[in-house]
Design a protein with these regions (language model features):
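A structure-centric signal for secondary-structure junctions around beta-strands
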Residues: 36-38, 59, 102
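Short histidine-centered beta-strand/loop micro-motifs
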Residues: 30-33, 50-57, 74, 80-81, ...
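Double-stranded beta-helix
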Residues: 3-4, 98-125
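Short beta-strand His + acidic residue motifs that chelate non-heme Fe in jelly-roll/DSBH
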Residues: 51-52, 72-73, 90, 95-101, ...
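Short, conserved beta-strand element in jelly-roll/cupin
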Residues: 55-72
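A short, N-terminal "cap"/entry segment at the start of jelly-roll beta-barrel domains
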Residues: 1-46, 50-53, 121-125
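Short acidic-glycine-tyrosine-enriched beta hairpin
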Residues: 76-94
Length: 125
């Protein structure tokens, strides 16, 4: 990375970091380290659900559907992303999600701050 360029493949790189491609959790000095924004390539099998609700949320997020059918759940409503390119933006809202079909999403969150990771499920890396 001496030329300040990193080229990768989201499907290949994402599994090493639970889907995350960029954020505070990448090693300092890595071009993918950022305290400003986080980017995720999320691949979710049908029926996959966030293990627990995000509470005390202080960040904003943009979720874009690449393929599948993906539901973002909020305290008083849900938004279903059903067509490629459908998206939702939210800020400081508690939420969860559910993959109604096998889905691929791109998630962007800002700022990138520690403390929101869900504990790993048994057998998860």
């Amino acid at each position: 990375m001496a030329d300040n360029i990193y080229a990768g493949s989201a499907p290949a790189d994402a599994p090493a970091n639970r889907g995350w491609l960029l954020g505070h959790f990448m090693p300092a000095g890595d071009l993918r380290h950022s305290e400003e924004v986080e980017i995720k390539w999320g691949v979710h099998p049908r029926g996959d659900r966030r293990a627990q609700w995000v509470t005390g949320e202080s960040r904003a997020a943009l979720i874009i559907l690449v393929s599948g059918r993906f539901r973002i759940e909020f305290p008083h409503r849900s938004v279903v992303l059903a067509n490629p390119g459908d998206y939702v933006v939210f800020e400081r809202v508690e939420h969860s999600w559910y993959a109604e079909e096998e889905s691929v999403i791109v998630g962007v969150r800002w700022p990138s701050i520690p403390g929101y990771a869900v504990p790993l499920r048994p057998g998860e890396k």
